[in-house]
């Protein structure tokens, strides 16, 4: 049987927008060098918005089971001890999964006003460790969003010739599924829903997206003969989710470029054709991929038209530019590009 465990840790619904990320890190820390790792999580952070759920997950490899370390998130201590939720031995090494609930930290006034989520790890004793990957799941509370989710997490080693199956995978029969896995070297894996099979090659950290045909039954199997000679393959988590979100949709209703002295003034009318107001909005002027100008604008309400203008110096003026309209809502960022010819202005 596969070593390790995968457990259901959450099933439910909330008025919140869900965001998750899993990133390969591969950073080594040793006590002899007084190692300290600083890492900024690649997570959108709407200012002033409380979190409904926030879970930090670390995948750590070591030669020894005893490690002394401290973990902080946004300057607040998360753990002063190395206490993995799951540990699996692979050859001479151990792979550990550490799971932290950091909701209370992100809901402090200091964290709610920070645009980034920052983590530090200080190695204070024991053997060398390798931080293999970082995972983060966060749900931002708001009446414009509604999420249903079921989340399994842990650390499961599926060896050669082994298989692992799950039933009742999804939060409902119409949700999507994300299977998070890890393998140091390429490994062929077969996924089955009982009637169809999907063969994939996994290398490194992989987020495998599955449709709702896998909701009733999911089987994960490894090719091989139980010789143990191949690369290890781990299942780190499985997330089933269904989201509904009222979204803003910004459009450039009109564009009027006019020359004025030593610059070109572009007058714009921006409309919101969606059903929600953005948290933030901005205009970006691009010339062949280079940013020439950035301007924050008033986020328009649904149906509202906002008038704005942006200026480009003549000495920077190309034949044409791209106007990028960017807007953010909770954990999501969208943009729309429009080309503007300036040669005849």
State each model region's role.
Residues 1-265, 269, 334-345:
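Disulfide-rich extracellular domains of secreted proteins
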Residues 275-280:
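Short acidic/proline- and small/hydrophobic-mixed sequence motifs that coincide with surface turns
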Residues 286:
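HhH-family (HhH-GPD) DNA N-glycosylase catalytic core used in base-excision repair
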Residues 289-318:
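Intrinsically disordered, low-complexity Pro/Gly/Ser/Thr-rich segments with frequent PxxP/GP/PP motifs
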Residues 314-345:
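Terminal connector regions
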């Amino acid at each position: 049987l596969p070593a390790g465990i995968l457990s259901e840790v959450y099933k439910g619904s909330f008025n919140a927008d869900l965001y998750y990320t899993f990133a390969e890190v591969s950073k080594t820390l040793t006590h002899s060098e007084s190692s300290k790792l600083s890492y900024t999580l690649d997570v959108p952070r709407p200012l002033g918005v409380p979190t409904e759920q926030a879970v930090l997950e670390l995948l750590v490899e070591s030669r020894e089971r005893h490690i002394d370390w401290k973990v902080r998130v946004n300057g607040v201590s998360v753990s002063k001890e190395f206490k993995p939720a799951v540990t699996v031995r692979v050859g001479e090494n151990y792979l550990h999964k550490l799971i932290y609930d950091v909701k209370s930290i992100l809901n402090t006034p200091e964290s709610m006003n920070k645009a980034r989520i920052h983590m530090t790890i200080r190695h204070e004793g024991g053997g060398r460790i390798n931080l293999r990957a970082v995972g983060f799941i966060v749900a931002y509370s708001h009446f414009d969003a509604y999420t249903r989710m079921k989340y399994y997490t842990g650390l499961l080693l599926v060896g050669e010739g082994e298989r692992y199956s799950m039933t009742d995978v999804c939060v409902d029969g119409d949700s999507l599924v994300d299977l998070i896995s890890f393998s140091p070297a390429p490994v062929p894996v077969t996924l089955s829903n009982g009637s169809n099979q999907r063969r994939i090659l996994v290398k490194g950290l992989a987020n495998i997206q599955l449709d709702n045909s896998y909701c009733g039954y999911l089987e994960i199997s490894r090719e091989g003969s139980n010789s143990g000679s191949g690369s290890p393959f781990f299942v780190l988590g499985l997330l089933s989710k269904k989201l509904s979100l009222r979204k803003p949709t910004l459009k450039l209703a009109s564009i009027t470029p006019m020359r004025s002295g030593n610059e070109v003034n572009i007058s714009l009318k921006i409309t919101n054709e969606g059903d929600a107001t953005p948290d933030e909005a901005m205009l970006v002027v691009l010339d062949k991929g280079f940013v020439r100008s950035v301007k924050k604008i008033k986020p328009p309400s649904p149906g509202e038209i906002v008038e704005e203008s942006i200026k480009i110096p003549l000495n920077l003026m190309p034949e044409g530019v791209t106007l990028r309209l960017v807007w953010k809502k909770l954990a999501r960022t969208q943009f729309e590009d429009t080309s503007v010819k300036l040669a005849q202005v």
